[in-house]
């Protein structure tokens, strides 16, 4: 493992890139009882046009897929929800989506390896059906409408719309009610297969760990996959100048 050390802040990190492409960063800290892990994929709201590495298929997806996929990852085929399972263990777990990445995380003082089992199980084994995807559209649709009534969020989105003509940063992370209506299990599976590959992901672990030992624990739980290489993302070329001087939105 490669060691990176900062004498100024007295911190060190060990970095290892596995054969399947996954980057693992381990930050040993023996001064705290807390243990923390975050597993992220470089897939966010701006990634709506790409070429699948293994098939060279050019894919366009509806706005909001990265966020939709984050919501669906916790649901298991046996009817359980991994977020509930982690909380029942006393583990504080969460997930989030941004413009350029999605991440799954938890922190705990106890039962870290039980949490690691659950995290690495649900992130590597998605469960999509016509029924559960349709159900999620209603849930996320309510979330979108909630943000439509949030003045701060609307101010932020309207500013982006004024600043940019084509840049994907303008896309609302959750998409729109119309765009998520076009999401299907097939769309989710294509995006999962492309962006949730280890070669497009980073895992960071912090706590009182021996770096070599925790790295082996991660390796034992990884499904065997070959490094797929870099994903070709296609973005709109932004034009010079602002899009408009101001926006008006009245409800």
Please describe what each predicted stretch is:
Residues 2, 77-191:
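Acidic/histidine-enriched segments that form metal/cofactor-coordinating
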């Amino acid at each position: 493992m490669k060691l990176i050390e900062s004498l100024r802040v007295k911190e060190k990190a060990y970095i290892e890139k596995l054969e399947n492409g996954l980057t693992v960063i381990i930050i040993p800290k023996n001064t705290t009882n807390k243990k923390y892990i975050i597993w992220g994929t470089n897939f966010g709201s701006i990634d709506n046009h790409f070429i699948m590495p293994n098939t060279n298929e050019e894919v366009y997806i509806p706005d909001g897929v990265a966020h939709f996929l984050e919501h669906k990852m916790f649901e298991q085929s046996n009817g359980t929800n991994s977020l509930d399972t982690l909380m029942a263990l006393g583990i504080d777990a969460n997930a989030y989506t941004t413009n350029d990445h999605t991440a799954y995380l938890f922190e705990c003082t106890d039962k870290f390896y039980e949490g690691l089992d659950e995290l690495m199980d649900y992130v590597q084994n998605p469960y999509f059906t016509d029924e559960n995807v349709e159900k999620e559209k209603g849930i996320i649709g309510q979330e979108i409408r909630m943000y439509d009534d949030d003045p701060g969020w609307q101010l932020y989105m309207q500013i982006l719309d004024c600043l940019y003509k084509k840049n994907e940063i303008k896309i609302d992370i959750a998409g729109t009610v119309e765009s998520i209506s076009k999401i299907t299990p097939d769309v989710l599976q294509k995006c999962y297969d492309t962006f949730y590959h280890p070669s497009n992901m980073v895992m960071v672990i912090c706590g009182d760990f021996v770096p070599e030992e925790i790295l082996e624990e991660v390796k034992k739980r990884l499904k065997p996959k070959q490094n797929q290489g870099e994903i070709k993302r296609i973005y709109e070329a932004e034009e010079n100048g602002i899009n408009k001087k101001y926006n008006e939105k009245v409800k």
